[in-house]
Amino acid sequence: MFNINPLENLKLYISSRPPLVVFMISVSAMAIAFLTLGYFFKIKEIKSPEMAEDWNTFLLRFNDLDLCVSENETLKHLTNDTAAPESTVTSGQARTSTQSPQPLEDAGPVNISVAITLTLDPLKPFGGYSRNVTHLYSTILGHQIGLSGREAQEEINITFTLPTSWSSDDCALHGHCEQVVFTACMTLTAHPGVFPVTVQPPHCVPDTYSNATLWYKIFTTARDANTKYAQDYNPFWCYKGAIGKVYHALNPKLTVIVPDDDRSLINLHLMHTSYFLFVMVITMFCYAVIKGRPSKLRQSNPEFCPEKVALADA
C-alpha cells in the first residue's frame, strides 16, 4: 500500500535539501514583489521617465532665486511701452499661427504668463516707494535656474505684474515695511527652446491683471543659490532693499504621466511573471510533500553500511 506522510516528507525534504529550500523562499519573495509592483502600477499614476522636465519642475527652478528690489532703483513710468515688440510673440499667438514653424535658430522670443506667488520681504532700512509700483522686472541667464547646454546662456526676461499697487503708504500705516505676499502674474520672455514642450500651466493676462491705470516698473537684480552660498558672497547684496522670492505650488495636471495603456501592459507582464514563479514554487512544494527524502543516500556517509545492516538483521 502506497502511504504518504506529507508533514514527515516535508521535514525530510527541508533537512536534506537546504539549498533548494532557500531557492524556493527566494522565488516566492520575488513572485510577491512582482505581484505587488504590478498592483502598484495599476492603481498609481507614474511620472513618465521619458520626459526629463515638465512645467512643474521648470517653475520650481525659480524658487531658488532671490530678487533684490533696491531702494535706490530708478522707477520707470510705463505708459506707451506696454505693448510687446514685433519680434516677440505670445504663446497664444504661437499656437494659433497657421504658418509653418520656423527653425529653432530663427525663432523669436516667446512670452508665457503664469500665475505665481511672490513674496517681498523688506529689510529694516527699506522705506518703500512713494509711487505706486505694479510691475517688477528682472533679467537672468539660464544657468541661474539650473539649465544646461545651449539654454544655459539664454537670457530670460521676467516681469511680475502685481494685482495691487505696492507703495510706501503701507509702510507708513504700520510704522515699518512689512512682508507682503502677492499672487502675481509672471511673464517669461525667452527663446522657445528654454521652455518645456509639455502641457503648459493656465495662463494669466498681464494687461488686465493690475487695476492701476498708471504703473511703474522697477528693475531688480537676481542671484541664484550657488551665488548665495559662494565664498565671495556679499552680505550687503540687497542693503536697503526688499528681497523677493517666488513660490510655485505643484500642479498635478502639469506632470507627464505614463499612459493607461502602458501601465496596463506593465501590470500584465508583471502579473504573468509572478504567476509563473508561483507555479514553480507550488510544483517544488508538491514534490517535497510527495517525494520527501531522496531514496538514494550519499555513499560518502560513514554511518551507512549495507553489510552492517544485513548482519544486524541476521
Swiss-Prot record:
Q: Which family does it belong to?
A: Belongs to the TMEM248 family.
Main subcellular localization, coarse class? membrane
**Region described as Disordered: spans on this chain:** 79-107
Compositional bias of type Polar residues: which residue ranges?
80-102
The keyword S-adenosyl-L-methionine is assigned to this record: no
Entry keyword annotation includes Nucleotide-binding: no
Q: What is this protein called?
A: Transmembrane protein 248
Keyword entries, A-Z: Membrane, Transmembrane, Transmembrane helix
Instruction: Quote the InterPro entries the UniProt record gives.
Output: TMEM248/TMEM219, TMEM248/TMEM219_dom
Q: Where in the cell is it found?
A: Membrane
The domain of life is Eukaryota
Q: Kindly give the membrane topology term recorded for this protein.
A: Multi-pass membrane protein
Gene Ontology, cellular component aspect: membrane
Kindly list the residue ranges recorded as spanning the membrane.
21-41, 179-199, 236-258, 270-290
